[in-house]
Amino acid sequence: LTFDAVAALPTGEATKERPTLFKTMIGTLNHNYLIDLVWQAHLEGRDHGFQARNIVLHHDLAELWKAQQAINRWYIDWSGRQTEQSLDETVHFQFIGGDPGAMTRGDILLHVVNHATYHRGWIAEMFFQVPARNPTTDLPVYLQSLGHGSDSEPRHSG
């Protein structure tokens, strides 16, 4: 929903500098993507190679969307392979600033989801500066757009 809404904005609005930490909508979306890559590396036990959180890896929204979809698929596939035991495993890592850190795999996954949601809210707020109708960031609305909760969907018991 967010990428579609940003793509529908008038030309230049996604890259227009605004009074926000990552400067632009594209910058904020890139930050989300970069952080997804950082935590993927931590989960895989490898170095991510990033020295900053504000690097624009993809200046083009369509390219960024493709890259974001790829990392989203990785997280979906990775999540599907996890067990309660594996999600409780502690991962030791270094924050981008160099400080040591440790979190369970489950906490990392929770952080990745919450982090992206948080910054999508920043982007939605920037829409008021355009001005344009902001994309919804509510999970129930998103799930409804996917058809979740409809009578044709299988119900889970338990």
Features from the language model and the residues they span:
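Short, contiguous alpha-helical
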Residues: F3, E13-N54, F95-G158
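Short secondary-structure junctions
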Residues: A8-P10, Q82-T83
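Carboxylate-rich helix-loop segments that flank metal/cofactor sites and access channels
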Residues: E84-G97
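N-terminal leader/capping segments at the start of a protein or of a new domain
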Residues: L1, A5-A8
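Helix-adjacent hinge/juxtasegments
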Residues: R46-L87
